[in-house]
Structure formats: C-alpha cells, structure tokens
Amino acid sequence: MYTLVLLRHGESAWNKENRFTGWTDVDLSPQGIEEAHRAATLLHDGGYSFDLAYTSVLKRAIRTLWIVLDDLDLMYLPVHHTWRLNERHYGALQGLDKRETTEKFGKDQVQAWRRGYAVRPPALEETDPRHPRFDPRYAGLKKDDLPATESLEDTLARVVPYWNETIVPTLQDGKRILIAAHGNSIRALVKYLDGVPDDVITGLNIPTGFPLVYELDDDLHPIRHYYLGDEEEIRRATESVASQTATKK
C-alpha cells in the first residue's frame, strides 16, 4: 500500500478578500499561516512523515509547504516545484471580486466559470500585464503551454501527465510524498484518481489547510481517502469555499 497526502494551501490574501486568484501570486493571509501550522500539527499527531514534496511555483502553496516542513523538522527534504501544479488559470476574472462578478454576470454564469468542467472563463489578452508570458518564472515554457484561461479539464490535462511521469515513479519507489497545491489542481488529481464523473466533480470543494490522505493499492488505485482534522471544522471550511459567490441579501 502507498500513502499520499494532498494539501491545499492555507487561506491566501485574495481568498480572504474573496477574489478570483488563479495564477496571481498572492501570499498567505494571517489565517492562512495559522492553517498551515494546523496542518503540520495534524500530520505530526497522525504520525505522518515524508521523503519528498511537490508544490507549484506560486508562493501561497510554497509558503504553506515551508511552514509544514519546518514544523515537522523536515526542511531538508527535496522539494520539486512545477507550474503544472499551479491553480487553474482564471483568465480575465483574476483579481475580480467573486460576489460582485456574480451580481454582474449572474449566478449560473459565474458558477459555470468556477465549477464547470469544460467551461473556460474569458481569456486574458496577450497584451494584458497579467498574462503569464510577462512573468519570468514561466520564461522557459513554450508559448502553447502558457494559458490565458483554463477550464478544470485544461488543468487536469497538465496535472495528470506530471502525476504519471514524475510522481508515480517516486511513489512506486516507496517514497512518502506530500503535495502542497491548490484547490483546482487538487480537484483535477482527485477526479483522475477516483474516476469522478464530469458532472459530479463540479460539486467537489477542497478546504484550505486540511491534509487529504489517500491510501493507494499496489496499482495506485485508491483504497480510501480521508481528511485529517475535526469533521465539523472540515465541513464548515468546505461550505465556505462553496459559498464564495453567494450574493449579498
């Protein structure tokens, strides 16, 4: 049996402000820092340790991982950073307030942009300073690899090859792996591992800062998965993610 731990970063500054974030490189909020420490405590108390870690190239995931590894006295572990674990790119929605966007475009349209499996938000123009072609961290990527917007389907298309080509071999070598990533890159991986149907994955929300443990069989098929932490706190955190576009009454 293999064990894999997935961790969505702690609350970011734009999570707190309820803005679409995507590839915008915002940092953790004070609460997000606390959530990262809580995740480390849950892992420590559960007896989990790791041999290496994977994360994105966005600081909210990187800092979450740093805090967890520091608290577990594992700062020496090899850490692999990849854009393929980045959050889904939200295109021209990035930076916009989610509730205000819902009031402008309607609940159904914004929900489709947020959760529709194959629906892409409006794309960034290539001249938009928010476009990843202007960000030096992506300087080595081919133009075709730089998204101006993404659906969850697009996100899965970049996450799964990295999983199969890079992460799976390390699991099969017996390494204990922690992946600190983002709500949608984790949703993509969960969809792939569990075979979640397209119409069901739209209702899956990943809470910030709670470790998600997968136990996998010899063929890397899930035996079971579960969150570490208090069930009521996890429920509230998950519902909070789901309600981010609720309009003010």
Curated annotation (Swiss-Prot):
Site entry: Transition state stabilizer: H182
Reactions catalysed: (2R)-2-phosphoglycerate = (2R)-3-phosphoglycerate
Location of the active site: H9, E87
Domain of life: Archaea
Isomerase found in the keyword field: yes
Species in which this protein is naturally found: Methanosphaerula palustris (strain ATCC BAA-1556 / DSM 19958 / E1-9c)
Similarity-based family: Belongs to the phosphoglycerate mutase family. BPG-dependent PGAM subfamily.
GO MF, one example: phosphoglycerate mutase activity
Phylogenetic lineage: Archaea, Methanobacteriati, Methanobacteriota, Stenosarchaea group, Methanomicrobia
Protein name: 2,3-bisphosphoglycerate-dependent phosphoglycerate mutase
Name of a matching Pfam family: His_Phos_1
NCBIfam families: pgm_1, PRK14115.1
Gene (name only): gpmA
Residues that, per the record, bind substrate: 8-15, 21-22, 60, 87-90, 98, 114-115, 183-184
SMART domains: PGAM
Pathway: Carbohydrate degradation; glycolysis; pyruvate from D-glyceraldehyde 3-phosphate: step 3/5
Record-level GO BP terms: gluconeogenesis; glycolytic process
Class of this enzyme: isomerase
Main function: Catalyzes the interconversion of 2-phosphoglycerate and 3-phosphoglycerate.
